[in-house]
């Protein structure tokens, strides 16, 4: 099975810089991204789920505690678009 292609948005790049400034352990984020890249799924510990409302086409998972990752996922074309990362208050 082929792995997913990872694309990132400008917002994700900005959010990543904020996470770096906060001293968050980015290796945790990179582990989640690598797992998603392999087959588009995550272990239950990350509580991955689809969002609703304005975010109906997006997925969210908990990297650690209140640190979230939001992405779009196209399973037909094997593409993941990393949209944003941060706390609930940062993102919603």
Please describe what each predicted stretch is:
Residues 1-5, 11-27, 31, 52, ...:
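Enriched for short, Lys/Arg-rich terminal
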Residues 34-62:
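A short, surface-exposed loop/turn module that caps and links secondary-structure elements
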């Amino acid at each position: 099975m082929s792995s997913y292609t990872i694309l990132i948005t400008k917002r994700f790049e900005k959010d990543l810089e904020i996470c770096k400034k906060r001293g968050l352990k980015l290796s945790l984020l990179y582990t989640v991204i690598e797992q998603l890249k392999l087959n588009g799924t995550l272990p239950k510990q990350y509580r991955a789920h689809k969002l609703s409302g304005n975010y109906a086409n997006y997925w969210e998972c908990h990297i650690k505690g209140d640190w979230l990752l939001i992405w779009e996922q196209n399973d037909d074309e094997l593409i993941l678009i990393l949209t944003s990362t941060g706390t609930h208050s940062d993102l919603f």
